[in-house]
Amino acid sequence: AAAAAGFDYFEWSVQAFLQPRAEASTFAQALAAVRAAPLPCPVCNCFLPGDLKVTGPVVDDAALDAYAATACARAAEAGVDTIVFGSGGARQVPEGFNRARAEGQIAAFLRRLAPVARRHGVVIVIEPLRTGECNILNTVAECARLTRLVDDKAIRLLVDGYHWACNGEPETDIAAAAPLFRHMHVATK
């Protein structure tokens, strides 16, 4: 139905499609289903599960890096060239934890991830999430600043009309970040 309606592709979650925590045989089943679909799936969202924390006092960098490496390798195999890093549960800053330190943890993760993504032909796009879903990297301007800080072509920006409308972001911030855009979500408030 989506193909008949004129859609070009569909977007599915990393956790449901690429399944970085699952055995290769489980991923192979999902891959076969996607390959049989009438539309391709070049983009995956929901990158990190909520229990794989990127911020806070207990972050397992080795587990994050292994998960990300598997996700990127499977993305390449599946023809996925863009992975959306919204992952509000994973990046949520724990109460009382230093926000600047949390942003530094996210930047460090993205810097480690960038060469892995690049090696597999994948671009990671940071998704600004409205304040009701996450307490860090909520605006296009904040995510654009982080994208520039990481400074790697494998890390770009997603813009989502729903989140920017909910946050009441000025259109000038959206326009200023436009050179960093790789992907867009369209929804209404």
Where in the sequence are the language-model features?
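Short, small-residue-enriched loops and turns at beta-alpha junctions
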Residues: 17-20, 51-52, 90-92, 131-136, ...
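Hydrophobic alpha-helical segments and helix pairs
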Residues: 75-102
